[in-house]
């Protein structure tokens, strides 16, 4: 899709570009309270390993300033916080206030707050100075952004030279037998889980459809290059169900 067009996808629907952000907002307002529980159920807990792997790819050090973009409920930030220490800083930015509220309460309950900030922000127009962060990590958030290229360009602007972005996102299975099983699981079981646990089948149907509409591994790699990231690469996890992309700013 040409991201300058006046329409875009919302799951499998085609909607005016200026309406997608609000539609995604309503989805995450609906699922915020049960989001982490549903992640456990939908991935059978494997999302925890995916996130741990993504954090290892960040190569974090004490004193660094990290942007956890689309960080919502703080599941990545709680892993990052002890690695950068009290001398470091973790900024959790998310466009959705409901997700931030869940994350704020959860991290406070866990005693994780000394080096954490919460900021409501649009990934396409990040409200930070140029060359501000040592690393940016975005987990399962990029596919919900209306203009992904604009978001990647915004990330490139605010990251320091020598820093890099790590993108953890659902992708395309690389094994044909896995794809058939994955499709059946996604379209038959996950919306029903959403209805049973979160009382919201339609929002979880959108989340499944948004995964299918997200660029595959090579297409996202190309988009990162278009945003001026260099030395871009990726690792497939769980047979390509998830991929971790990384791109540098020099």
UniProtKB/Swiss-Prot annotation:
EC number: 2.1.1.163, 2.1.1.201
Binding residue positions for S-adenosyl-L-methionine: 73, 94, 122-123
Record has Transferase as a keyword: yes
Catalytic activity, as annotated: a 2-demethylmenaquinol + S-adenosyl-L-methionine = a menaquinol + S-adenosyl-L-homocysteine + H(+); a 2-methoxy-6-(all-trans-polyprenyl)benzene-1,4-diol + S-adenosyl-L-methionine = a 5-methoxy-2-methyl-3-(all-trans-polyprenyl)benzene-1,4-diol + S-adenosyl-L-homocysteine + H(+)
Superkingdom of origin organism: Bacteria
Alphabetically ordered keywords of this record: Menaquinone biosynthesis, Methyltransferase, S-adenosyl-L-methionine, Transferase, Ubiquinone biosynthesis
Record keyword Nucleotidyltransferase present: no
UniProt GO molecular function: 2-methoxy-6-polyprenyl-1,4-benzoquinol methyltransferase activity; demethylmenaquinone methyltransferase activity
Pathway it works in: Quinol/quinone metabolism; menaquinone biosynthesis; menaquinol from 1,4-dihydroxy-2-naphthoate: step 2/2; Cofactor biosynthesis; ubiquinone biosynthesis
GO biological process: aerobic respiration; menaquinone biosynthetic process; methylation
Main function: Methyltransferase required for the conversion of demethylmenaquinol (DMKH2) to menaquinol (MKH2) and the conversion of 2-polyprenyl-6-methoxy-1,4-benzoquinol (DDMQH2) to 2-polyprenyl-3-methyl-6-methoxy-1,4-benzoquinol (DMQH2).
HAMAP family associated with the record: MenG_UbiE_methyltr
Membership in a protein family: Belongs to the class I-like SAM-binding methyltransferase superfamily. MenG/UbiE family.
Record protein name field: Ubiquinone/menaquinone biosynthesis C-methyltransferase UbiE
Organism whose genome encodes this protein: Coxiella burnetii (strain CbuK_Q154)
């Amino acid at each position: 899709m040409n991201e300058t067009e006046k329409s875009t996808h919302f799951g499998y629907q085609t909607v005016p570009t200026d309406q997608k952000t609000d539609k995604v907002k309503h989805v995450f307002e609906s699922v915020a309270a049960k989001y982490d529980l549903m992640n456990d159920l939908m991935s059978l807990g494997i999302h925890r390993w995916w996130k741990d792997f993504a954090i290892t790819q960040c190569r974090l050090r004490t004193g660094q300033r990290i942007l956890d973009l689309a960080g919502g409920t703080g599941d990545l930030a709680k892993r990052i916080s002890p690695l950068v220490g009290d001398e470091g800083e973790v900024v959790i930015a998310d466009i959705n206030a409901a997700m931030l509220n869940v994350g704020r309460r959860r991290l406070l309950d866990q005693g994780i707050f000394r080096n954490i900030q919460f900021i409501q922000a649009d990934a396409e127009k990040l409200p930070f100075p140029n060359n501000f962060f040592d690393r940016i990590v975005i987990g399962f958030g990029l596919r919900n952004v209306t203009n992904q290229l604009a978001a990647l360009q915004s990330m490139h602007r605010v990251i320091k030279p020598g820093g890099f972005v790590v993108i953890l996102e659902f992708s395309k299975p690389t094994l044909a037998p896995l794809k058939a099983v994955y499709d059946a699981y996604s379209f038959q079981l996950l919306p029903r889980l959403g209805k049973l646990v979160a009382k919201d089948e339609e929002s979880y149907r959108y989340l499944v459809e948004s995964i299918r509409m997200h660029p595959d591994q090579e297409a996202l790699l190309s988009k990162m290059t278009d945003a001026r990231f260099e030395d871009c690469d990726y690792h497939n996890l769980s047979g390509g169900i998830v991929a971790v992309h990384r791109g540098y700013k020099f």
